[in-house]
Regions:
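Short, charge-dense linear interaction motifs
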Residues: 2-122, 126, 133-220
Length: 220
């Protein structure tokens, strides 16, 4: 999108345009959040009613199974960090179910695919991407801002030349708000193992940049 203003004031004649750019980045650090929660074995027998739930599977057992699945998926122990512990009331006034959240630091999305294939979804409350990073993010920021500036100059030049004038020097540059990070991924995944491929279209970071530039207008 472009914004354009042209004016003649005591400051002289000028044109002000807004240039934008987008930079797509492949992350090299992925934070994947998994939350586990106690459950009742009867939930999965296909016949018991909720009032008949009696056999609660403890959190320690669920965590042990998750950690084993993570080892099988190639996730090292030092990449797993406990984020928080909480509880959920099964029903007001009745027994509550304890939960625990883990933050996994991964290096590529293939690890998520392997995790989804190995994990037992019973006891898994949510699985989602928490944050995407890249160690060269500042370099990408610079490239994105420069590209937005060049786009603004190109726009201003052909507009001024169309009126038989010439583009002069830069009088002002404003870096507009909302520059930067826009992760491209679903907020929360399904915990179904068949959903592994659902990440295929959500594996990049998109940074958006917007720069407003005022140029002097000169006679030909």
């Amino acid at each position: 999108a472009w914004g354009t203003a042209q004016a003649a004031t005591d400051e002289g004649r000028y044109i002000e345009v807004t240039g934008t750019s987008e930079v797509e980045i492949v992350p090299d650090e992925i934070h994947y959040i998994i939350e586990i929660k106690e459950y009742f074995a009867e939930e999965f027998d296909g016949k018991s009613k909720e009032e008949d739930y009696r056999t609660k599977v403890p959190l320690a057992q669920i965590e042990e199974g998750l950690r084993e699945a993570l080892r099988e998926a190639g996730v090292p122990n030092d990449a797993v960090r406990t984020q928080e512990i909480g509880d959920y009331w099964r029903e007001s006034g009745r027994e509550f179910l304890v939960s625990k959240r883990f933050d996994l630091t991964l290096t590529d999305f293939k690890q998520i695919d392997r995790i989804v294939r190995h994990v037992d979804t019973k006891g898994i409350h949510t699985m989602r991407i928490g944050e995407l990073k890249n160690k060269d993010m500042q370099l990408y920021h610079q490239k994105g801002k420069i590209a937005a500036l060049m786009a603004a100059r190109e726009k201003a030049a052909y507009l001024v030349e169309a009126l038989g004038q010439k583009l002069g020097g830069v009088e002002r540059i404003i870096e507009n708000g909302n520059n930067g990070f826009s992760p491209v991924f679903t907020a929360q995944s399904n915990v179904s193992s068949s959903d592994a491929a659902s990440f295929d279209g959500f594996r990049t970071i998109k940074n958006h940049y917007s720069m407003s530039v005022r140029f002097e207008i000169l006679d030909q």
